[in-house]
Amino acid sequence: MKHKKLLAMLLALSMAFALTACKKSAEEPSVSPSDSVTESAEPSETPSAESSTPVMGEDVRLAVLSGPTGIGAAKLLSDSDADATVNHYEYTIAADNSELVAGLTGSDPAFDIATVASNVAVNLYNKTDGGVKIIALGTLGVLHILESGGNETVSSVADLAGKTIWAVGQGANPEYILRYVLSENGLDPDKDVTILFADATEVTQKLMTGEAEVAMLPVPAATAAIIKSEGKVRAALDMTEEWDTLNTGSQLIMTAVVARTEFMEQHPDAVAVFLEEYAGSIDYVNTNVDDAAELVAGFGITPSAPIARQAIPQCHLTYIAGKDMGPAISGYYDILWQADPAAVGGSLPDDGIYY
């Protein structure tokens, strides 16, 4: 009997203890959902899947043409060397367009993105059946009419009548632009003037010696001739300004940025990042001329910083992308086609040329 009473007492004490423990546990504070959110909201190196994840950089093989076409990319190249870009650029500074064409075409292309002459861009599009497209426009006209010997006889296009003009770019943008501007100002390029072609080095030498009284050169060659002549060569006409007075409905655009279509389809984020970094580079060059001139010369895009310093404002650097590209340059392509269908690869491009 005593054993039964003892057992009952032990059972009662056990139940009472269990109830007390449960009550105590229920009254203890627990970690609230808001506490855990606050804790997990601390900055971390790895964003959560729900947060806005930044685009990761990708490898891009970039080619830049030396001269005015490459000036706008100088800051991007400098940032790339300093590992300050999002994309990882393996870049090449090419001496002429033929190197770029070879690197963008064929079964084993060497470049993904390149800056090229605007007429080369449309030729690439036609040649590759859409395998290369324009993703941005980067430089307006860079051609200037120069006069040597301390003369000041040319102040308008009409003043070129009867003169011999030494020029660069036979069968390319410069020739077509010169002939068009002359024609639209009432001068027959084949009768009213004499046009002789040579490379930039030879034209510059003829200006310096006075053998050429009038010449057309692009920046920075035009800039270099003016600086080196110490006042004997002057800028008479800016062909971009002369083009604008004609109200063609399009801009005189000398540089196009192109990319292989296959690369764009496989790496759209890399293209988007490049466009942002390229636009930033152009803005930097335009607004920080002295510093940019050092970069441009350092990459060998121009012969020296003083030349780059004067050339940058003359390059009409710009950035046009997206839906604005077609209206900006299509009229220019139409003019090239009328001058020589071969200048645009035999046919005018459709809207598929623009990215």
Regions inferred by a protein language model and the residue ranges of each:
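Bacterial N-terminal signal peptides that target proteins for export
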Residues: M1-M9
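C-terminal motif of bacterial Sec signal peptides marking the signal peptidase cleavage site
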Residues: A18-A21
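Bacterial signal peptide processing site
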Residues: K23-S25
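Short, glycine-/small- and polar/acidic-enriched structural segments
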Residues: S48-D188, T194-F197, E213-V219, R234-L237
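A bilobed periplasmic-binding-protein/Venus flytrap-type ligand-binding module shared by bacterial periplasmic
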Residues: K75-L77, L143-V154, Q251-A270, A321
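Pocket-lining segment of extracytoplasmic ligand-binding domains
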Residues: S118-V120, E202-L295
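Secondary-structure end/capping motifs
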Residues: M264-A339
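Conserved C-terminal helix/tail region of periplasmic/extracytoplasmic solute-binding proteins
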Residues: S330-Y355
